[in-house]
């Protein structure tokens, strides 16, 4: 690299976001965080590779934004309050314009999520971004994938399927005449929103929770396996957006909602008498047994990194 690692960090990655938990941030050998008394720490990490997780021509600001939101979504699924983030960035070269754009997107998403950047690493190689996020909850109030029980309702936030349509638009495989609809769907892929506030609400009422990254059916399968139950999904109940339904037929819209992935919505189970939070929809139920069932099974049920 033409710039030293120290110069890169100082120039592009210092002062991105603020957080009450940060005692010491970027610039020392390690960061120092203050965990609130009576709380426990949640930590998660996500790696994004060019070509596997984002398109080669995606703007650097969008790559940064998407990478942090994907990691933050794991905190949302636990019901955690965000504290801080770490970034490990592998670059083929030190491109000042690319780094400036990346830093802009990174600063925006760190501020929006409450995940100030407190450290990380840079090295040379094929483009890859690893984001580690930290959050906290009261010691006995975090969510897991393992609490669903027969009789619970299966619910989802938002409108899954939009991100899959957005990816097809960005790849040039889906042509949309209405530029505003095209932009809305593309943004669902490039600029997802981690449901952090919803997650903090759900931790008091949900029996189990997971974020949708691999696809709704695949992630429902994770809930079922971890909880030792069976889950039934009713595709007629899927909350499909008007934008999605305006660009593809109903069957394709359902398939993307069930298997598209990259939605970063929350999929969760609620006891039968618990009120459903605003912006969420019941799409199935938990029963005794194992596995998942659905009246419609897409050709590909979800993303598997090692299936190809």
PLM regions with names:
Residues 24, 56-70, 94-104:
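Glycine-rich anion/phosphate-binding loops
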Residues 164-182:
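Short, compositionally biased
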Residues 131-143, 180-201, 249:
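Active-site glycine-rich loop that binds ribose-phosphate moieties when present
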Residues 67-78, 107-110:
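A short, N-terminal amphipathic alpha-helix
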Residues 1-15, 92-116, 123-129, 134, ...:
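Glycine-/charge-enriched secondary-structure boundary and capping motifs
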Residues 1-53, 57-59, 78, 87:
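Extreme N-terminal cap/leader segments of soluble proteins
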